């Protein structure tokens, strides 16, 4: 059976916070596709972007991009106050430098609220995604601690996953590890809600893979000694 759809990267959706998100505008695009008798919404890779901000170069094959988390949905869940929401911005080209500087400030506030009283949904998410989440969160925490240095520039004991070095890093960076886990919970909560809405309206999401994921990602640290 023939079917058609539209390619629309999440970051290209209009939105008030400098980039397209998984919020109202994404749901409205699903409505548009359904009204236009389309079947597919094709997107680009949705992982956390690395150097150059290309969706095809990600820090993880499994994690979601924190830039796509919708602040308004976090506020609706009681994780942000209205006063903590950034001022709306004019729709225009994405300023990734501004996102890099400003988004973590807001996400930390939401994460702190969640982690102060973890929900059963959060705990279930962490358990279900334990195969990649813990390693990813530790990788990102160490990377932040080391000024975003690439894996090749890490100390040998961390790069080769020496148990003592990993244990020390987990203890030293426990708060940041929890932050990165919470952010992934935010992303996947919103992503799953959007996907369910799209599917219920006869729209299938077609993704892509980050083909430029090389040394600066979390997964090689799990099994490969470089």
Q: What feature does the model see in each segment?
A:
Residues 4-8, 41-42, 205-207:
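Hydrophobic faces of well-ordered beta-strands that scaffold small-molecule active sites
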Residues 10-22, 171-185:
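The substrate-binding groove and active-site-proximal loops of carbohydrate-active enzymes
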Residues 33, 43, 139, 198, ...:
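Conserved, mostly hydrophobic/aromatic
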Residues 25-46:
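Catalytic domains of carbohydrate-active enzymes, especially glycoside hydrolases
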Residues 215-226:
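Single conserved hydrophobic/aromatic residue that forms the stacking wall/gate
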Residues 67, 76-180:
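Extended, charge-enriched "interface" segments that sit outside catalytic cores
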Residues 180-212:
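Conserved, well-ordered alpha-helix/loop/beta-strand core segments that scaffold catalytic motifs
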Residues 46-77:
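Aromatic-lined substrate-binding rim segments of carbohydrate-active enzymes
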